[in-house]
């Protein structure tokens, strides 16, 4: 399956996924897919103050799509796709347009309630059996990710797990 990162920002996580894909699945058709604003100027209008605060902190200095593609070309990695804009809309478009594809790893790093909840609604059914959804800011004060995850999982029999030794990701689930 594909690796999807929601919240690419400066690209360090995205480049890690690309390198791991090259090492462990060099002949695979699986893609590394990134969702972020990139150069797109349309920003979401959040209801919650904490979400607005987090967006303001991350509203600058992210990597451009051009630079991300250029670096991946240098590494001879072409199995990537980028979606620019509001993740609430772009993840919905991806889910609609990627018939038959599955996600092996979904990494959520959007830092906010509304985006996290919509990503889970849009992409959960695209997850492969045995796939992993990892949460970068679960249980961190000032980020709405925890509330969104708890709300989404409230009617599902899924147990959240964590690494006691890791600062991030703070939680993950394995799809059965």
Q: Could you tell me what each predicted segment is?
A:
Residues 1-176:
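S-adenosylmethionine/decaboxylated-SAM
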């Amino acid at each position: 399956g594909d690796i999807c990162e929601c919240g690419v920002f400066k690209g360090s996580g995205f480049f890690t996924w690309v390198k791991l894909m090259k090492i462990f699945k060099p002949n695979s058709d699986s893609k590394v897919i990134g969702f972020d604003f990139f150069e797109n100027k349309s920003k979401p209008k959040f209801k919650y103050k904490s979400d607005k605060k987090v967006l303001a902190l991350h509203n600058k200095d992210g990597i451009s799509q051009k630079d991300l593609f250029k670096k991946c070309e240098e590494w001879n990695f072409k199995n990537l796709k980028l979606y620019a804009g509001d993740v609430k809309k772009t993840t919905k478009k991806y889910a609609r347009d990627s018939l038959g594809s599955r996600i092996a790893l979904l990494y959520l790093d959007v830092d906010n309630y509304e985006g996290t909840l919509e990503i889970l609604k849009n992409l959960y059914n695209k997850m492969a059996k045995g796939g992993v959804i990892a949460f970068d800011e679960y249980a961190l004060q000032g980020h709405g990710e925890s509330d969104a995850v708890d709300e989404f999982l409230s009617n599902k029999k899924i147990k959240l797990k964590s690494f006691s030794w890791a600062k991030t990701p703070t939680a993950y689930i394995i799809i059965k």
